């Protein structure tokens, strides 16, 4: 029989840099999870994605064991990195703070495709383009 899930915890952590300090320790500790085991496993799985924030969804079971799924980095982080800017615009309607090419947009869409609620790369590109526009980043042909 399958183990019963008692909690699902969602965190966004730096790739390869999870440690027992907040927010990881308190979030997992209250469910009785072995914090160091999670940190070691998460760091091992994400060490090749250094520099990105990687969202993770942790399922905690009755016997205090756990499994977790790592997601792709947030679209905004990928857009900022591609545009080579520090952060998006506070007032996106007034002007752009940077730009990305269609090729970069397609690359980001391909990266995000497994986590987006769509099936084609074209629709993923439209979603990412909307995110970029809201951040004040122009998409150039």
From Swiss-Prot:
The question of whether Protein biosynthesis is a record keyword is answered with: no
Q: Name one GO cellular component term.
A: cytosolic large ribosomal subunit
| Protein name (database record) | Large ribosomal subunit protein uL11
Modified after translation how? One or more lysine residues are methylated.
Known function: Forms part of the ribosomal stalk which helps the ribosome interact with GTP-bound translation factors.
Q: Which HAMAP family match?
A: Ribosomal_uL11
Q: How does it assemble?
A: Part of the ribosomal stalk of the 50S ribosomal subunit. Interacts with L10 and the large rRNA to form the base of the stalk. L10 forms an elongated spine to which L12 dimers bind in a sequential fashion forming a multimeric L10(L12)X complex.
Q: List the Gene Ontology MF annotations in alphabetical order.
A: large ribosomal subunit rRNA binding; structural constituent of ribosome
Gene Ontology biological-process entries: translation
Sorted keywords for this record are:
Methylation, Ribonucleoprotein, Ribosomal protein, RNA-binding, rRNA-binding
- Keyword Ribonucleoprotein carried by entry: yes
- Source organism of this protein record: Synechococcus sp. (strain RCC307)
Q: What is the similarity comment for this entry?
A: Belongs to the universal ribosomal protein uL11 family.
**Classification via PANTHER family:** 60S RIBOSOMAL PROTEIN L12, LARGE RIBOSOMAL SUBUNIT PROTEIN UL11M
């Amino acid at each position: 029989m399958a183990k019963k899930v008692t909690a699902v915890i969602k965190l966004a952590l730096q790739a390869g840099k999870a440690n027992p300090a907040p927010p990881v320790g308190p979030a997992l500790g209250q469910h009785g999870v072995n914090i160091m085991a999670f940190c070691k496993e998460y760091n091992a799985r994400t060490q090749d994605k250094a520099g990105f924030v990687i969202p993770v969804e942790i399922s905690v079971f009755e016997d205090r064991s756990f499994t977790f799924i790592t997601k792709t980095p947030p679209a905004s982080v990928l857009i900022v990195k591609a545009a080579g800017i520090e952060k998006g615009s506070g007032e996106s309607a007034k002007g752009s703070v940077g730009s990305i090419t269609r090729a970069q947009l397609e690359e980001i869409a391909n990266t995000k495709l497994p986590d987006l609620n769509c099936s084609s790369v074209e629709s993923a590109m439209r979603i990412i383009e909307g995110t970029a526009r809201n951040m004040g980043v122009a998409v150039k042909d």
